């Protein structure tokens, strides 16, 4: 399975990981200096869940993001699936 949420469209993002040295000014130091920068990826918080669909009258096994799970609690599974289909996820 991919790392993309089928209900919200969340997918991995790219960013940087910074290596720093020095003592922070807050701690009476001269300040922090960046000594290196490495590419990294930020992954969405994915969860595999079995959810009951009342329309299809069966369980659906979905790998969804944690924010999609909160959205399902708030709106209901059928509304979230309809919304995802209309947005093209």
Swiss-Prot record:
Family matches, as Gene3D superfamilies: Ribosomal protein L28/L24 (2.30.170.40)
NCBIfam families, per database record: L28 (TIGR00009)
UniProt KW keywords: Ribonucleoprotein, Ribosomal protein
Protein family membership: Belongs to the bacterial ribosomal protein bL28 family.
Top-level taxonomic group: Bacteria
InterPro entries in the record: Ribosomal_bL28, Ribosomal_bL28/bL31-like_sf, Ribosomal_bL28_bact-type, Ribosomal_bL28_sf
Annotated protein name in UniProt: Large ribosomal subunit protein bL28
Gene Ontology biological process terms in this record: translation
GO MF entries: structural constituent of ribosome
GO CC list: ribonucleoprotein complex; ribosome
